[in-house]
């Protein structure tokens, strides 16, 4: 199961709009780390990773140190906590997918999150725990993050998750909103795949804006 824009939606017009709230946090203010710099430092970190490994998946420490190379581990941790708090404030669960998780659990099926994200597994688990109903969160068996494995879903994260779980591809159904990452890449890995097309793009954007207004 995909995470962002499938299980969790952000109450913003675009995902990067979270950074405009993030730049108001004490940790980011101290460094004058604004939304624009957060975007450019992620791009720089990805370019550097491509040069070094041929792949583009990065972690939060790599992103932060692309902007501020001399950050201490404590400063990195403080920035990550601020970013997690901003995501917790912005994200909400998509009810049909929550019900899908509950239905899977009732049938005795395992639920696994596979996400293209710069969050590591502990941070993503905390985000899920803070935003999902408790029963839905407890139904999640495993979490795989592209940042931890160095591969996006398009680059082979599905196959690495299967290898870790020791299950055959055809025993798995992957559900997600992104046609390339969640449908095509999962199919290439041998999984059953379902493309969760929520709405026409203008409707999805309107729902995000409504969520922002309601919050």
Predicted regions and their residues:
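Substrate-recognition element of Asp-dependent hydrolases with the DxDx(T/V) motif
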Residues: 76-92, 97-130, 140-145
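Asp-based phosphoryl-transfer active-site loop
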Residues: 1-12
């Amino acid at each position: 199961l995909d995470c962002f824009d499938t299980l969790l939606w952000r109450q913003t017009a675009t995902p990067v709009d979270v950074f405009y709230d993030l730049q108001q946090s004490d940790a980011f203010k101290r460094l004058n780390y604004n939304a624009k710099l957060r975007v450019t430092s992620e791009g720089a970190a990805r370019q550097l990773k491509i040069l070094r490994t041929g792949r583009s998946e990065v972690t939060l420490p790599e992103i932060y140190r692309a902007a501020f190379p001399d950050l201490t581990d404590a400063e990195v941790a403080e920035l990550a906590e601020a970013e997690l708090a901003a995501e917790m404030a912005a994200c909400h669960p998509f009810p049909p997918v929550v019900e899908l998780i509950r239905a899977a659990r009732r049938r005795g099926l395992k639920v696994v999150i596979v996400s293209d994200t710069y969050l590591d597994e502990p941070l993503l688990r905390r985000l899920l725990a803070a935003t999902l109903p408790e029963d839905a969160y407890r139904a999640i068996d495993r979490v795989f993050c592209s940042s931890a494995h160095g591969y996006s879903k398009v680059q082979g994260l599905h196959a690495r998750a299967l290898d870790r779980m020791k299950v055959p591809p055809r025993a798995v159904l992957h559900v997600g909103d992104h046609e390339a990452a969640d449908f095509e890449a999962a199919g290439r890995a041998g999984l059953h795949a379902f493309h969760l097309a929520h709405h026409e793009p203008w409707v999805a954007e309107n729902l995000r804006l409504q969520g922002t207004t309601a919050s």
